[in-house]
Amino acid sequence: MEKQIKYHTPEQALIKIRDWCAYQERCQQEARDKLYDYGLKTDDVENIIAQLVNENFINEERFAIAFAGGKFRIKKWGKVKIKQELKAKRVSDYCIKKGLAIIDNTDYINT
């Protein structure tokens, strides 16, 4: 079954993506993929991503910390799997290190 593309203007997409990012932490790549699903062109997508970062709707470091903490506590993922998933989402190495740093070594060993 083919994915149906919903076409939005950049203004409509910005409103929708703000709500989507406010609901839970998102990385830039997730937001970028969602904007392309809205049928936007590359220039519009990159402008909206820049605006979301400036407005602090998207923060890669905050995302990495939330992602790593959640996957470790809830899904019991190890650091290697968390790192692989963050890399797949194109999160920077700096942010990945920040995210993994919140996992307590004592808790990690006991898992």
Report the location of each language-model feature:
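An alpha-helical, amphipathic repeat domain used for nucleic-acid recognition
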Residues: 1-111
